[in-house]
Design a protein with these regions (language model features):
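Conserved phosphate- and dinucleotide-binding cores of soluble alpha/beta proteins
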Residues: 1-134
Length: 134
């Protein structure tokens, strides 16, 4: 299932069993999303255009599992992160967390996730890897 942003806080408790299983995982595979004008969070209806612009203004560069973070890999406080209904971000310090992401729009988000230790493995293409190493 796709991660989502709940319309209210009570919706977060709907899948406690699944969230508990996710917390116990020793390996996680995640995608890294960007926050460009046609970001999947917006296109898929999880955030409004106004929320996307507010996230961008707050310095957000990417998201994983719906959790929005800035260029330092820090979660953006408040805003849509208070409504995320997906599993918490896995800890790259205690489990293998592999991100799959590519493309120039995602370089800032991938860099932030790797630098902060949100992920400790990456599947990407050669062009994106070169941009990350530049």
């Amino acid at each position: 299932p796709r991660p989502g942003i709940a319309s209210c806080c009570t919706a977060r408790s709907a899948s406690k069993k699944n969230l508990a299983l996710a917390a116990e995982a020793s390996v996680s595979f995640v995608g890294v999303g960007d926050l460009v004008p046609n970001a999947p969070l917006y296109e898929d209806g999880f955030v409004t255009r106004a929320e996307l612009k507010a996230l961008q203004k707050a310095g957000a560069v990417g998201e994983m599992l719906g959790w929005v973070f800035d260029s330092q890999g820090e979660l953006v406080s408040g805003m849509t992160n208070e409504r995320v209904a997906s599993a918490p971000l896995p800890s790259g310090g205690r489990a293998l967390v592999v991100a799959a992401a590519r493309g120039p729009n995602k370089v800032a988000a991938i860099h932030a996730a790797v630098a902060r230790g949100l992920v400790n493995g990456l599947i990407t293409d050669e062009d994106t890897a070169a941009q990350l190493l530049a």
